[in-house]
């Protein structure tokens, strides 16, 4: 696995040792991509003095932030990302490269307009276009006409439709020539604030629930097939402490709160917007706020030791950013085992082809199929 990252900024060589977070042994995964390299190359070749203040958005593991802190020791950087692993990865990479003293203010992506004024803005194109529109609309609240955003992206994702979406959200955009299959989108704010759209509320009538999502949360306006299967097949019994691991909008926890009226719920996700959506949905459905705790974390890495669950519900992702990987699922299963009481249940839903039953048998020594359809399977393991 390549960990050596090289770049030049304002003539300053930036030689860094960068790692993904959490650590992975997959040799095909690294802590940056060509779009990171292209953004820094573009800045270096712009023949302008490197700014002192930056807003860096969607910097997966801190490659951009580390390079800026190396090239300009007095840099004042706001690091904005929705994912907890991005924050932890950036902090770890700064520390391991002797940059722990860099001035970096860590923020999520729910109030970007308040950090944008007077800063040079660098960002990576997110996969979720609703999240992109929301991000740019937030920035439009405070950017003056002529302020520039530089956005790195894979060339295959850039087309006229995307440029039109950007223009509608904040101002006109043009794309550079291709380099290493990436392009830089230069966005010029037009100075007109756009309304930041409020998420719609939708019903799950078969379970008597109302649900809303912030912009970077999966399943924006309907119950996804896996969650639907899971909600119809929750385990029977009395559970006093239930963790919804990778909670998303919290819909599984909402159903668990109905099903287990005496249970305390822990809703955990690495997406700040997911955790906030879950919090809003708990209130939207008039559930007792004293029964729930909402946790923004890398799986269960920082769950207090005193929390011992008798049930963990989990719908594990099979990607991290654009990388297809199973190491997040492995971490979830290991963390769930650690957090469960003896005899506690891990109850998961996953795509049939992912073969999670093999992992669970290896880790727990047991696994049984609870339900399945053409695409998804519900599996259960006992600690």
Swiss-Prot record:
- Pfam families xrefs: MTS
Q: What is its main location?
A: cytoplasm
Major enzyme class: transferase
MF annotations from Gene Ontology: 23S rRNA (guanine(1835)-N(2))-methyltransferase activity; nucleic acid binding
Please list every transmembrane segment annotated in the UniProt record, as residue ranges: none
Q: Which reaction does it catalyse?
A: guanosine(1835) in 23S rRNA + S-adenosyl-L-methionine = N(2)-methylguanosine(1835) in 23S rRNA + S-adenosyl-L-homocysteine + H(+)
Ordered alphabetically, the record's keywords are: Cytoplasm, Methyltransferase, rRNA processing, S-adenosyl-L-methionine, Transferase
Q: Give the Enzyme Commission number.
A: 2.1.1.174
Q: Which Gene3D superfamilies match?
A: Vaccinia Virus protein VP39 (3.40.50.150)
GO CC term, one of those recorded: cytoplasm
Where is the protein situated, by its record's location annotation? Cytoplasm
Its biological purpose: Specifically methylates the guanine in position 1835 (m2G1835) of 23S rRNA.
Family indicated by similarity: Belongs to the methyltransferase superfamily. RlmG family.
The name under which this protein is listed is Ribosomal RNA large subunit methyltransferase G
Species whose genome carries this gene: Shewanella amazonensis (strain ATCC BAA-1098 / SB2B)
Its gene?
Answer: rlmG
């Amino acid at each position: 696995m390549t960990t050596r990252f090289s770049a030049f900024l304002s003539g300053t060589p930036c030689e860094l040792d960068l790692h993904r977070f959490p650590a992975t042994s997959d040799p095909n995964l690294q802590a940056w991509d060509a779009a990171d390299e292209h953004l820094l190359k573009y800045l270096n070749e712009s023949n302008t003095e490197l700014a002192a203040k930056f807003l860096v958005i969607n910097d997966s593991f801190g490659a951009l932030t580390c390079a800026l802190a190396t090239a300009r020791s007095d840099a004042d950087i706001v690091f904005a990302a929705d994912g907890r692993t991005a924050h932890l990865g950036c902090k770890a990479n700064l520390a391991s490269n002797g940059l722990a003293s860099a001035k970096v203010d860590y923020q999520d992506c729910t109030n970007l307009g308040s950090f944008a004024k007077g800063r040079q803005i660098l960002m990576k194109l997110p996969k979720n276009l609703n999240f992109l529109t929301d991000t740019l609309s937030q920035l439009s609240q405070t950017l003056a006409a002529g302020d520039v955003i530089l956005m790195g992206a894979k060339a295959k994702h850039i087309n006229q439709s995307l440029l039109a979406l950007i223009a509608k959200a904040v101002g006109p955009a043009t794309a550079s020539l291709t380099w290493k299959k990436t392009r830089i989108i230069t966005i010029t704010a037009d100075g007109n604030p756009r309304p930041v759209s409020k998420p719609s509320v939708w019903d799950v009538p078969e379970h008597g629930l109302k649900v809303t999502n912030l912009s970077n949360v999966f399943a924006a306006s309907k119950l996804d097939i896996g969650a639907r299967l899971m909600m119809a097949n929750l385990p029977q019994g009395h559970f006093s402490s239930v963790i919804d691991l990778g909670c998303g909008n919290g819909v599984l926890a909402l159903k668990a709160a109905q099903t287990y009226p005496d249970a305390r719920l822990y809703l955990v996700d690495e997406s700040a917007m997911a955790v906030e959506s879950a919090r809003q949905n708990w209130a939207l459905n008039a559930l007792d706020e004293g029964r729930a705790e909402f946790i923004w974390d890398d799986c269960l890495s920082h769950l207090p030791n005193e929390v011992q669950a008798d049930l963990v519900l989990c719908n594990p992702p099979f990607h991290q950013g654009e990388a297809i990987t199973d190491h997040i699922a492995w971490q979830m299963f290991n963390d769930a085992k650690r957090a469960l009481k003896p005899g506690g249940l891990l109850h998961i839903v996953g795509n049939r082809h992912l073969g999670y039953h093999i992992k669970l048998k290896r880790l727990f020594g047991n696994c049984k199929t609870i339900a399945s359809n053409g695409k998804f399977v519900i599996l259960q393991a006992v600690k």
